[in-house]
Regions:
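Conserved N-terminal catalytic/coupling substructures associated with nucleotide/phosphate chemistry
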Residues: 1-215
Length: 215
């Protein structure tokens, strides 16, 4: 791993703050927690993890063990494993680790928890959010390269009509109002998203679904 000295580059990244493509870690003490960040970036648009920084400047990587823990997160606690690109920058007498994560072509990338249960995450603004059944359905269809064919039965029209009337609904509300189970409604909402009829957005710790503008 090559060591670089580029103070301006790191200072610029720190000045950007955390966002959809960047996360700061003051220190690393748990590889499983880092796996969540790796999963979120890989399942969204890719991104960068800066280790040894905080919002107001450089803290420095405490030991080489933190570097090994990032590598362990990618190989031991991500399923499937993901490849990372890492660089160390020597800034202000301290080391900063930059970890580049590419968007995966094998979504979802799962992070294993303490019980080795797999969970997929997505990156929204500056947060790692647990993926919902809609994400999983979309990724499943993308992997299988299925064509989206919408058949407008009474059931499909009912969903669109309800969304038009209500404005925005949660997955649970969609299930209740249509009297479909979560598995059925999740598949239909995923198809509608892939077809460009509706969109999902995240607000106050909840995913909502609404018609796209013009629909």
């Amino acid at each position: 791993m090559k060591t670089n000295s580029n103070t301006l580059y790191i200072q610029k990244l720190i000045s950007e703050g955390e966002h959809i493509h960047q996360d700061f870690k003051f220190a690393i003490s748990d590889a499983r927690k880092i796996a969540k960040s790796l999963s979120a970036f890989a399942n969204t648009e890719g991104g960068r993890l800066l280790v040894g920084v905080k919002d107001n400047g450089v803290a420095g990587v405490r030991s080489e063990e933190e570097i090994y823990m990032v590598e362990a997160a990618a190989t031991l606690y991500c399923r499937p494993e993901i490849e990372l690109e890492t660089h160390i920058y020597h800034i202000e007498g301290k080391d900063v680790l930059e970890v580049q994560i590419n968007e995966s072509t094998q979504k979802p990338i799962y992070a294993l928890d303490e019980n080795n249960h797999p969970w997929a995450y997505v990156r929204i603004k500056d947060e790692n959010i647990l993926a919902n059944p809609i994400h999983l359905n979309i990724w499943k269809h993308d992997r299988e390269e299925k064509r989206v064919i919408i058949t407008y039965t009474q059931r499909e029209q009912q969903i669109l009509t309800i969304l038009k009337q209500q404005g925005a609904l949660t997955l649970g509300q969609c299930s209740k109002l249509t009297r479909m189970n979560r598995k059925q409604i999740s598949r239909l909402l995923a198809d509608f998203i892939r077809f460009g009829l509706i969109e999902q957005y995240f607000e106050e710790h909840t995913f909502y679904f609404r018609l796209k503008d013009g629909e």
